[in-house]
Regions:
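Acidic, polar-rich low-complexity tracts and alpha-helical solenoid repeat scaffolds
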Residues: 4-5, 16-256
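Bacterial N-terminal signal peptides that target proteins for export
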Residues: 1-9
């Protein structure tokens, strides 16, 4: 059994070697038409790396010619499927600018915005790329209000906005974690005001209550009563807005 597997692996390695060797010869070939034909074949077979490499080589040769539109779109799409989102976004945007009346322009515009979406990092990192992605997707939504991709674009925008909200919430919550309650109250209040419909509002209200309560009970006598009143207001808002809050027992214990 092992001998059969080893033979299969050997044959596959030989095939791969000659296949790679043939592709290298193709890259050195100066016949642009042959490269174009092979790029199309690789594209049809979803061999995105080879297709994108060939399309990149021949794209300048066909600029301004009828084939240029098809090559640019296929090149961009190959990059997208290869997950090279930075270069794919650039190529799709170039397509939109170069071929504004193409039947593929709407698809290219969405794909460009989608590439920016894919560049959005996790919430703990800088969110400049997320802001750019939201802007690009919103531009698509505004320009193509009847697009078949409208719902998907809106969903992507919502997802990115929630990511920004979560980052803002985590920053605000951090002040509570390090027991800087004065700053926590200020930042959590700002968060709740800025994002009234956020899915993290319940959590923000609890940590606002906790910060207000901790600040009050650790205050000097002259400030304690007023600060306790403020904490009670936040507690009542939490319980009224979320009567089955996951923080009910913890909040009730502090109030007692």
């Amino acid at each position: 059994m092992n001998k059969i597997i080893n033979k299969i692996l050997l044959l596959f390695s030989v095939f791969l070697f000659f296949s790679c060797n043939e592709f290298q010869k193709l890259l050195r070939n100066e016949d642009v038409k042959i490269k174009y034909e092979m790029a199309e074949k690789y594209y049809e077979n979803e061999e995105w790396r080879r297709a994108s490499t060939l399309f990149e080589q021949i794209q300048p040769k066909y600029r301004g010619k009828p084939q240029g539109e098809r090559i640019t779109f296929f090149y961009a799409n190959s990059l997208l499927n290869k997950k090279n989102y930075v270069l794919a976004a650039f190529q799709f945007e170039s397509f939109v600018k170069s071929y504004p009346i193409s039947q593929k322009v709407e698809e290219a515009a969405f794909n460009a915005a989608y590439c920016y979406y894919k560049q959005s990092p996790k919430h703990s990192l800088d969110q400049a790329d997320t802001m750019t992605a939201i802007e690009k997707l919103q531009n698509f939504i505004n320009f193509y209000p009847y697009s078949e991709k409208l719902e998907e674009a809106n969903d992507l925008v919502q997802e990115l906005r929630i990511k920004l909200e979560y980052k803002a919430f985590e920053i605000a919550k951090q002040y509570n974690t390090i027991r800087d309650y004065t700053s926590a109250i200020k930042v959590l209040n700002s968060f709740i005001s800025e994002y009234p419909g956020t899915p993290y509002r319940e959590d923000a209200l609890f940590y606002l209550f906790d910060s207000s309560y901790q600040l009050a009970v650790n205050s000097i006598q002259i400030k304690r009563l007023e600060r306790l009143k403020n904490a009670i207001k936040v507690y009542e808002e939490l319980i009224n807005d979320y009567p089955e809050t996951k923080f009910f027992n913890e909040s009730k214990k502090m109030m007692n």
